[in-house]
Amino acid sequence: MDGLTSSDSIVIAVVPRDRFSMFPRCLEALYAYTDVRFRVIVVAGGADRTTKEYLHELQLQKDNMSVVLVDRLLMQGEARNIAMRQADERFCVVLENDTIVHENWLSPMLECMREEGAAAVMPLIFWYRGIHAAGCILEEREKDGAVVFHHKIMYTEIRRKQIDYPECHCILIDRHLLPGIEVFDDVEPFDVDLGLTLRKYGLSVFLEPRSVVTYSAGPPWEVRDMPLTNLRWDAASWKAHNRRFMQKWGVTYNPSAKLASYRRQQFKLGLARWYPSRITVGLSNVGASLANRLQSLVIRGPHRITWGKSRQLR
Protein backbone atom coordinates (compact mmCIF):
# COMPACT_ATOMS: atom_id res chain seq x y z
CA MET A 1 0.00 0.00 0.00
CA ASP A 2 1.33 3.46 -0.89
CA GLY A 3 2.02 5.80 2.00
CA LEU A 4 0.11 8.94 2.83
CA THR A 5 1.60 11.92 0.98
CA SER A 6 1.30 15.65 1.47
CA SER A 7 -1.27 15.78 -1.33
CA ASP A 8 -3.54 13.25 0.36
CA SER A 9 -6.42 14.32 2.55
CA ILE A 10 -8.48 12.49 5.12
CA VAL A 11 -12.24 12.69 5.31
CA ILE A 12 -13.81 12.17 8.72
CA ALA A 13 -17.48 11.22 8.65
CA VAL A 14 -19.19 12.02 11.94
CA VAL A 15 -22.52 10.26 12.46
CA PRO A 16 -24.86 10.18 15.46
CA ARG A 17 -25.16 7.05 17.55
CA ASP A 18 -28.02 7.63 19.97
CA ARG A 19 -27.70 11.27 21.16
CA PHE A 20 -27.67 14.43 19.07
CA SER A 21 -26.46 16.36 22.11
CA MET A 22 -23.01 14.76 21.84
CA PHE A 23 -22.03 16.58 18.64
CA PRO A 24 -20.31 19.54 20.38
CA ARG A 25 -17.99 17.42 22.55
CA CYS A 26 -17.11 15.15 19.65
CA LEU A 27 -16.42 17.90 17.13
CA GLU A 28 -14.50 20.12 19.56
CA ALA A 29 -12.13 17.25 20.35
CA LEU A 30 -11.87 16.35 16.68
CA TYR A 31 -10.70 19.83 15.72
CA ALA A 32 -8.40 20.10 18.74
CA TYR A 33 -6.55 16.81 18.32
CA THR A 34 -6.44 15.99 14.60
CA ASP A 35 -2.90 16.70 13.38
CA VAL A 36 -3.17 15.84 9.68
CA ARG A 37 -4.98 17.63 6.88
CA PHE A 38 -8.63 16.63 6.91
CA ARG A 39 -12.18 17.59 6.14
CA VAL A 40 -15.35 16.69 8.00
CA ILE A 41 -18.70 15.41 6.79
CA VAL A 42 -21.44 15.44 9.41
CA VAL A 43 -24.59 13.43 8.70
CA ALA A 44 -27.64 13.96 10.90
CA GLY A 45 -31.08 12.57 10.19
CA GLY A 46 -34.17 13.81 12.00
CA ALA A 47 -32.16 16.24 14.11
CA ASP A 48 -33.84 18.75 16.42
CA ARG A 49 -33.69 22.51 15.90
CA THR A 50 -30.91 23.08 18.44
CA THR A 51 -28.68 20.50 16.78
CA LYS A 52 -29.34 21.87 13.30
CA GLU A 53 -28.52 25.41 14.42
CA TYR A 54 -25.31 24.30 16.11
CA LEU A 55 -24.13 22.37 13.05
CA HIS A 56 -25.05 25.24 10.74
CA GLU A 57 -23.09 27.77 12.82
CA LEU A 58 -20.07 25.49 13.03
CA GLN A 59 -20.15 24.88 9.30
CA LEU A 60 -19.94 28.64 8.75
CA GLN A 61 -16.88 28.79 11.00
CA LYS A 62 -15.03 25.81 9.51
CA ASP A 63 -14.04 25.87 5.85
CA ASN A 64 -13.34 22.12 5.87
CA MET A 65 -16.73 21.00 7.17
CA SER A 66 -19.92 20.06 5.36
CA VAL A 67 -23.23 19.04 6.91
CA VAL A 68 -25.77 16.67 5.39
CA LEU A 69 -29.19 16.92 7.02
CA VAL A 70 -31.93 14.41 6.33
CA ASP A 71 -35.53 14.99 7.40
CA ARG A 72 -35.99 11.61 9.05
CA LEU A 73 -34.11 9.55 11.60
CA LEU A 74 -31.46 7.28 10.09
CA MET A 75 -30.27 3.82 10.97
CA GLN A 76 -26.55 3.25 11.55
CA GLY A 77 -25.79 1.89 8.10
CA GLU A 78 -27.86 4.53 6.34
CA ALA A 79 -25.98 7.41 7.95
CA ARG A 80 -22.58 5.87 7.24
CA ASN A 81 -23.40 5.09 3.62
CA ILE A 82 -24.68 8.63 3.02
CA ALA A 83 -21.39 9.97 4.36
CA MET A 84 -19.28 7.54 2.35
CA ARG A 85 -21.04 8.57 -0.85
CA GLN A 86 -19.94 12.16 -0.20
CA ALA A 87 -16.29 11.11 0.12
CA ASP A 88 -13.73 11.38 -2.68
CA GLU A 89 -10.70 10.82 -0.48
CA ARG A 90 -8.91 7.50 -0.23
CA PHE A 91 -8.86 7.43 3.56
CA CYS A 92 -12.11 7.77 5.46
CA VAL A 93 -12.67 7.73 9.22
CA VAL A 94 -16.18 6.89 10.39
CA LEU A 95 -16.62 8.36 13.86
CA GLU A 96 -19.70 8.09 16.06
CA ASN A 97 -20.55 11.38 17.72
CA ASP A 98 -20.35 9.98 21.25
CA THR A 99 -16.74 8.95 20.71
CA ILE A 100 -14.13 11.47 21.84
CA VAL A 101 -10.71 11.47 20.19
CA HIS A 102 -7.49 12.27 22.03
CA GLU A 103 -4.12 13.72 21.14
CA ASN A 104 -2.29 11.92 18.30
CA TRP A 105 -5.28 9.67 17.62
CA LEU A 106 -5.15 9.53 13.82
CA SER A 107 -1.51 9.33 12.72
CA PRO A 108 -0.86 5.92 14.34
CA MET A 109 -3.87 4.41 12.56
CA LEU A 110 -2.66 5.77 9.22
CA GLU A 111 0.81 4.35 9.90
CA CYS A 112 -0.69 0.97 10.78
CA MET A 113 -2.79 0.97 7.62
CA ARG A 114 0.23 1.82 5.49
CA GLU A 115 2.52 -0.78 7.07
CA GLU A 116 0.00 -3.63 7.30
CA GLY A 117 -1.98 -3.04 4.12
CA ALA A 118 -5.18 -3.13 6.17
CA ALA A 119 -8.58 -2.25 4.76
CA ALA A 120 -9.75 -1.06 8.19
CA VAL A 121 -8.05 -0.02 11.43
CA MET A 122 -9.64 0.61 14.81
CA PRO A 123 -8.12 2.41 17.82
CA LEU A 124 -8.00 1.28 21.43
CA ILE A 125 -11.36 2.30 22.90
CA PHE A 126 -11.92 3.29 26.52
CA TRP A 127 -15.13 4.06 28.42
CA TYR A 128 -16.30 4.57 31.99
CA ARG A 129 -15.46 0.97 32.94
CA GLY A 130 -11.91 1.06 31.57
CA ILE A 131 -11.10 -0.64 28.28
CA HIS A 132 -14.18 -0.89 26.11
CA ALA A 133 -12.55 -2.74 23.20
CA ALA A 134 -9.04 -3.85 22.25
CA GLY A 135 -10.14 -5.63 19.11
CA CYS A 136 -12.73 -8.31 18.37
CA ILE A 137 -12.42 -11.96 17.41
CA LEU A 138 -14.45 -14.73 15.79
CA GLU A 139 -14.07 -18.37 16.84
CA GLU A 140 -15.41 -21.53 15.17
CA ARG A 141 -15.66 -25.00 16.66
CA GLU A 142 -17.54 -28.21 15.90
CA LYS A 143 -20.41 -29.14 18.22
CA ASP A 144 -23.29 -31.60 17.68
CA GLY A 145 -22.85 -31.65 13.93
CA ALA A 146 -22.80 -27.89 13.51
CA VAL A 147 -20.14 -25.21 13.53
CA VAL A 148 -20.63 -22.95 16.55
CA PHE A 149 -19.44 -19.48 15.73
CA HIS A 150 -18.52 -17.12 18.61
CA HIS A 151 -17.78 -13.44 18.46
CA LYS A 152 -16.42 -11.47 21.36
CA ILE A 153 -14.63 -8.29 22.31
CA MET A 154 -11.05 -8.45 23.57
CA TYR A 155 -9.78 -6.47 26.56
CA THR A 156 -6.20 -7.75 26.81
CA GLU A 157 -3.14 -8.16 24.55
CA ILE A 158 -2.85 -4.43 24.03
CA ARG A 159 -0.64 -4.38 20.95
CA ARG A 160 -0.97 -3.86 17.24
CA LYS A 161 -2.60 -7.02 15.93
CA GLN A 162 -4.85 -8.35 13.21
CA ILE A 163 -8.42 -8.76 14.41
CA ASP A 164 -11.56 -10.27 12.92
CA TYR A 165 -13.86 -7.28 13.09
CA PRO A 166 -13.74 -3.71 14.44
CA GLU A 167 -15.90 -2.06 17.04
CA CYS A 168 -17.73 0.57 15.01
CA HIS A 169 -17.30 3.59 17.28
CA CYS A 170 -14.27 4.72 15.27
CA ILE A 171 -12.88 3.09 12.12
CA LEU A 172 -10.31 4.16 9.53
CA ILE A 173 -11.10 2.73 6.08
CA ASP A 174 -9.01 2.54 2.91
CA ARG A 175 -11.61 3.18 0.23
CA HIS A 176 -9.20 2.11 -2.55
CA LEU A 177 -9.47 -1.46 -1.26
CA LEU A 178 -13.27 -1.31 -1.35
CA PRO A 179 -14.17 -0.25 -4.90
CA GLY A 180 -17.87 -0.66 -5.46
CA ILE A 181 -18.39 -2.31 -2.06
CA GLU A 182 -20.95 -0.77 0.29
CA VAL A 183 -19.64 -2.22 3.54
CA PHE A 184 -22.29 -0.91 5.93
CA ASP A 185 -25.58 -2.78 6.09
CA ASP A 186 -28.37 -2.31 8.60
CA VAL A 187 -28.30 -5.80 10.01
CA GLU A 188 -27.48 -6.88 13.56
CA PRO A 189 -24.95 -7.50 14.96
CA PHE A 190 -23.80 -4.53 12.90
CA ASP A 191 -20.08 -4.70 13.63
CA VAL A 192 -19.86 -8.47 13.08
CA ASP A 193 -21.52 -8.01 9.69
CA LEU A 194 -18.84 -5.51 8.75
CA GLY A 195 -16.10 -7.95 9.73
CA LEU A 196 -17.67 -10.81 7.78
CA THR A 197 -18.05 -8.57 4.73
CA LEU A 198 -14.38 -7.59 4.84
CA ARG A 199 -13.37 -11.22 5.32
CA LYS A 200 -15.54 -12.25 2.36
CA TYR A 201 -13.39 -10.02 0.15
CA GLY A 202 -10.12 -11.16 1.72
CA LEU A 203 -9.50 -7.83 3.46
CA SER A 204 -7.79 -7.42 6.82
CA VAL A 205 -8.64 -5.43 9.95
CA PHE A 206 -6.12 -4.26 12.56
CA LEU A 207 -6.11 -2.78 16.05
CA GLU A 208 -3.67 0.11 16.56
CA PRO A 209 -3.51 0.77 20.34
CA ARG A 210 -1.26 3.83 20.05
CA SER A 211 -4.43 5.51 18.83
CA VAL A 212 -6.83 6.06 21.73
CA VAL A 213 -10.44 7.26 21.83
CA THR A 214 -13.13 7.26 24.50
CA TYR A 215 -16.68 6.05 23.97
CA SER A 216 -18.84 8.34 26.10
CA ALA A 217 -21.89 6.19 26.83
CA GLY A 218 -25.06 7.75 28.19
CA PRO A 219 -26.07 9.27 30.52
CA PRO A 220 -26.50 12.18 30.30
CA TRP A 221 -29.40 12.42 27.89
CA GLU A 222 -31.34 15.50 26.90
CA VAL A 223 -35.00 15.69 25.92
CA ARG A 224 -34.01 16.28 22.29
CA ASP A 225 -32.12 12.97 22.27
CA MET A 226 -35.12 10.78 22.97
CA PRO A 227 -36.38 10.13 19.40
CA LEU A 228 -32.95 8.94 18.28
CA THR A 229 -32.30 7.08 21.54
CA ASN A 230 -35.58 5.19 21.21
CA LEU A 231 -34.75 4.23 17.62
CA ARG A 232 -31.27 3.04 18.56
CA TRP A 233 -32.50 0.96 21.51
CA ASP A 234 -35.65 -0.50 19.95
CA ALA A 235 -35.52 -4.23 20.68
CA ALA A 236 -38.15 -5.08 18.05
CA SER A 237 -36.14 -3.25 15.40
CA TRP A 238 -32.99 -5.07 16.50
CA LYS A 239 -34.76 -8.43 16.15
CA ALA A 240 -35.85 -7.57 12.62
CA HIS A 241 -32.32 -6.56 11.66
CA ASN A 242 -30.99 -9.71 13.31
CA ARG A 243 -33.29 -11.81 11.12
CA ARG A 244 -31.83 -10.08 8.09
CA PHE A 245 -28.34 -10.88 9.36
CA MET A 246 -29.22 -14.57 9.68
CA GLN A 247 -30.71 -14.64 6.18
CA LYS A 248 -27.74 -12.79 4.71
CA TRP A 249 -25.10 -15.12 6.14
CA GLY A 250 -27.14 -18.33 6.38
CA VAL A 251 -26.73 -18.67 10.15
CA THR A 252 -28.74 -19.00 13.33
CA TYR A 253 -28.03 -16.59 16.15
CA ASN A 254 -28.68 -16.67 19.87
CA PRO A 255 -29.84 -13.11 20.63
CA SER A 256 -30.28 -13.47 24.39
CA ALA A 257 -27.18 -11.55 25.47
CA LYS A 258 -27.81 -8.68 23.08
CA LEU A 259 -31.48 -8.41 23.92
CA ALA A 260 -30.55 -8.37 27.61
CA SER A 261 -28.37 -5.33 26.97
CA TYR A 262 -31.29 -3.64 25.22
CA ARG A 263 -33.57 -4.37 28.17
CA ARG A 264 -30.99 -2.89 30.54
CA GLN A 265 -30.79 0.24 28.43
CA GLN A 266 -34.58 0.58 28.26
CA PHE A 267 -34.76 0.13 32.04
CA LYS A 268 -32.25 2.96 32.48
CA LEU A 269 -34.33 5.23 30.26
CA GLY A 270 -37.48 4.55 32.27
CA LEU A 271 -40.46 6.84 31.65
CA ALA A 272 -38.37 9.10 29.42
CA ARG A 273 -38.86 6.57 26.62
CA TRP A 274 -42.59 7.35 26.43
CA TYR A 275 -42.90 10.75 28.13
CA PRO A 276 -39.75 12.74 27.44
CA SER A 277 -39.55 15.87 29.58
CA ARG A 278 -36.93 17.59 31.68
CA ILE A 279 -38.24 15.76 34.73
CA THR A 280 -38.37 12.24 33.28
CA VAL A 281 -35.06 12.61 31.44
CA GLY A 282 -33.46 14.03 34.57
CA LEU A 283 -34.67 11.04 36.58
CA SER A 284 -33.32 8.71 33.90
CA ASN A 285 -29.93 10.40 34.10
CA VAL A 286 -29.76 9.89 37.86
CA GLY A 287 -31.00 6.30 37.70
CA ALA A 288 -28.74 5.36 34.80
CA SER A 289 -25.68 6.76 36.56
CA LEU A 290 -26.38 4.48 39.52
CA ALA A 291 -27.12 1.52 37.24
CA ASN A 292 -23.85 2.01 35.36
CA ARG A 293 -21.93 1.77 38.62
CA LEU A 294 -23.61 -1.55 39.37
CA GLN A 295 -23.22 -2.79 35.80
CA SER A 296 -19.48 -2.15 35.96
CA LEU A 297 -19.29 -5.21 38.22
CA VAL A 298 -20.74 -7.49 35.54
CA ILE A 299 -18.40 -9.38 33.19
CA ARG A 300 -19.81 -9.80 29.71
CA GLY A 301 -19.53 -13.15 27.95
CA PRO A 302 -19.23 -13.86 24.21
CA HIS A 303 -22.23 -13.80 21.92
CA ARG A 304 -22.82 -16.94 19.90
CA ILE A 305 -23.73 -17.67 16.32
CA THR A 306 -24.34 -21.21 15.06
CA TRP A 307 -23.52 -21.92 11.43
CA GLY A 308 -24.95 -24.84 9.48
CA LYS A 309 -22.29 -27.54 9.11
CA SER A 310 -21.73 -26.81 5.43
CA ARG A 311 -21.66 -23.05 5.96
CA GLN A 312 -18.22 -21.90 7.07
CA LEU A 313 -16.91 -18.55 5.90
CA ARG A 314 -13.21 -18.35 5.17
Predicted regions and their residues:
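Active-site-adjacent helix/loop segment of glycosyltransferases
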Residues: 196, 200-311
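Short, flexible, basic/aromatic active-site loop/helix in glycosyltransferases
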Residues: 140-163, 168
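Glycine-rich, basic loop-to-helix element that forms the pyrophosphate-binding segment
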Residues: 70-87
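A conserved acidic beta->alpha catalytic loop
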Residues: 44-54
